[in-house]
């Protein structure tokens, strides 16, 4: 088992895979994984995650949406987390899930052999996507990226604990 914590406090104990896939809170989610998990402050509006200044809007899958509504987040703020590898540039994903696509500007592009890290911006929100090197684009380019919301994580903005 692995333990993750802050000074003087254990935040979560579990196998590395459990901690990675099911973090107990935002601290643990951001601590494990490289690049780190992306976090966005959003509002849940009519089944969509709406970013700051309405910079983006993503349709929440039905199962996730039901749980978020049951917990009282419809119309309220929450923190949406997604790992860089759960952001896709592949045409098949973009076509299959058009309601989870954002158009981003690449701030920094790192070609790392078989994969690329794209540091992107949508309005005031910044994030990193880990994509196949075939999807590499130069800094300054625009790119459509799809967020796999079936792998999304949600955190309460006050407690930073995982919502479910």
What are the residue ranges of the model-derived segments?
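Glycine-centered tight beta-turn/hairpin loop motif at sheet-sheet or coil-to-beta transitions
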Residues: 53-55, 122-125
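Internal alpha/beta loop-helix hairpins
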Residues: 1-57
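Short flexible coil/turn linkers enriched for glycine and charged/polar residues
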Residues: 34-36, 74, 112-114
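Conserved beta-strand residues within beta-sheet cores
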Residues: 25, 36-41, 84, 101-106, ...
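Short beta-strand micro-motifs in enzyme catalytic cores
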Residues: 38, 78-79, 116-118
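Short aromatic-glycine-enriched beta-strand elements
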Residues: 48, 113-119
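Glycine/charge-rich catalytic "coupling/switch" loops of P-loop NTPases
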Residues: 21, 48-106, 136-164
